[in-house]
């Protein structure tokens, strides 16, 4: 399941979902501070949510 975690630059929630086996991505207007830029999208979370790429958004 592909999950978008909106308004999250720390990647704490993203990491927790990844540890549970989900394909999770954080999204924020800022660069991430969690150390996994490959799991982070810099941009508008609303536009990303409507892209149709995700099964769930938090």
What are these regions (language model features)?
Residues 1-58:
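Catalytic phosphate/metal-binding cores of nucleic-acid and nucleotide-processing enzymes, i.e., regions
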């Amino acid at each position: 399941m592909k999950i978008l975690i909106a308004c999250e630059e720390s990647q704490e929630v993203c990491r927790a979902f990844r540890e549970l086996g989900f394909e999770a991505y954080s999204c924020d207007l800022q660069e991430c501070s969690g150390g996994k830029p490959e799991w982070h999208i810099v941009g508008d979370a609303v536009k990303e949510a409507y892209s149709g790429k995700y099964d769930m958004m938090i």
